[in-house]
Amino acid sequence: MGHTAEFIFPVDMKKIPRLDALFIRANTDPMNTTYVAARMAQMYGVPVIDDPSSIQICADKINMYMHLMKKNVSMPRTKFLKKKELDEVLAAQLFEELGMPLVLKEPSTSFSVRVEKVSSVSELLKVARRFFKLSDWIVVQEYIESRFDWRVGVINGQLLYACRYIIPSETFKIQASVNGHIVYCDVESVPADQVPPEVIELGCEAGNAIGKGMYGVDIKESNGKLYVIEVNDNPSLDGGEDAHYPDMFQKIISYLMTGDACSYADELSNKVSLSHDFEGEYGLGAATGMSNPSALTENEVCSYKIDF
């Protein structure tokens, strides 16, 4: 395509304003240098993957799920549990409302760490208390059983690739520590014409709920219904996901170097750092990527039917 690429590192941050585009391929987090690089690109109108807004949203599961809720994206029934409300009565109520087992997630989780399945009140209390050492809020979801997850890669609202993550028999996650050993999912790339259209449609819908960048959308199917499990910025591209998509990197480069990415970069650079895209009880938390919805009522386990 006539483009060249060079690797840059934290010491090269001063080069960013002179770049035509920035493609981040390191673990992203609002608390590390990848976010600084993304923000600098945003400030100078340099097209960037991943953009700082996407990093903020996807780094906080509560923030991410609220973006999906706002757009009515299909997802498991979900509640946000506040630290000071945790007790046996509430734990039992969660099982009544969401079923058994439940999945608990600490909001800053990544790579399936701090995601656990619980099947009793005592187990829920034990895991929740451990997660509450890291966050004042945790995510509680109904458990969706499936043999594999669809991973739909999306860029600018369009399909980039699709694959299946075959879940290891020892766990319910795509990656887990089992008896001191890490087990990983198998990856099966699936040609676009063999992916159910509704899977692609839901993946693109979920990506659009977050932004216009590049995302990996995890989807489960159960009893004929599809559920978005999460949306990831900075999705994996080196595990064979693109085996049937030889033009994947061409699409990424084309996006970065065309008007769509440039327009999005300009749009982001014109936003104030604390945007108020969400007006409601979680407004500031959703906009800044912080799980701190302090305005919620005292006795509330925040329902998935949040009024925006």
Regions found by a protein language model. Give the residues of each.
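Hydrophobic residue at the +6 position relative to the catalytic HRD Asp in the kinase catalytic loop
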Residues: 217-219
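Short, hydrophobic alpha-helical segments
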Residues: 256-264
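Glycine/Thr-rich phosphate-binding loops of Rossmann-like dinucleotide-binding domains
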Residues: 31-32, 112, 225
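ATP-binding N-terminal substructure of ATP-dependent carboxylate-amine bond-forming enzymes
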Residues: 1-49, 305
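ATP-dependent carboxylate/phosphate-activation module, predominantly the ATP-grasp catalytic core
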Residues: 119-132, 137, 141-209, 221, ...
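Short glycine-rich anion-binding loops that position phosphate/pyrophosphate groups of nucleotides
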Residues: 27-29, 108-109, 234
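Active-site nucleotide/adenylate-binding loops and adjacent lid/helix of ATP-dependent enzymes
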Residues: 16, 41-45, 53-150, 193-201, ...
